[in-house]
Swiss-Prot record:
Similarity comment: Belongs to the DsrH/TusB family.
NCBIfam families on file: PRK13510.1, sulf_tusB_dsrH
Protein name per its UniProtKB record: Protein TusB
Main location: cytoplasm
Subunit-structure text: Heterohexamer, formed by a dimer of trimers. The hexameric TusBCD complex contains 2 copies each of TusB, TusC and TusD. The TusBCD complex interacts with TusE.
Alphabetical UniProt keywords: Cytoplasm, tRNA processing
Subcellular location: Cytoplasm
Function (record text): Part of a sulfur-relay system required for 2-thiolation of 5-methylaminomethyl-2-thiouridine (mnm(5)s(2)U) at tRNA wobble positions.
Family annotation (InterPro entries): DsrEFH-like, Sulphur_relay_TusB, Sulphur_relay_TusB/DsrH
HAMAP family on file: Thiourid_synth_B (MF_01564)
Keyword set includes Cytoplasm: yes
GO cellular component terms attached to this protein's record: sulfurtransferase complex
Organism this protein belongs to: Yersinia enterocolitica serotype O:8 / biotype 1B (strain NCTC 13174 / 8081)
Length: 95
């Protein structure tokens, strides 16, 4: 399953999300959700304790002036790779 997180980690329950994910899932952070994968953040520490693949939309990182502040644990992707993720994961859950 592809989980898309578009809200700041301060306005969504990442712990609840992480109870649902498996090692076969992917989590894509976009819009304000990109703040969840900031280096040394509490939300990143939660995310690193699961086995899902982490992705972050590069355009949203740039738009928020967060270049260089995103953890290397999350892969920066563009819209083309976003489409690839939706094709790979037939089911999607917006968080």
């Amino acid at each position: 399953m592809l989980f898309t997180v578009s809200h700041s980690p301060y306005h969504c329950d990442l712990s609840a999300l992480l109870r649902l994910v498996t090692s076969e899932d992917a989590i894509l952070f976009l819009q304000d959700g990109v703040m969840a994968v900031l280096k040394n953040s509490e939300s990143l520490n939660l995310l690193l304790n699961n086995q899902a693949s982490l992705f972050v939309l590069e355009d949203d990182v740039i738009a928020r002036g967060l270049c260089g502040q995103i953890s290397d644990s999350a892969m920066l992707i563009g819209y083309t790779h976003f489409v690839d993720l939706t094709l790979k994961h037939q089911q999607q859950l917006a968080w």
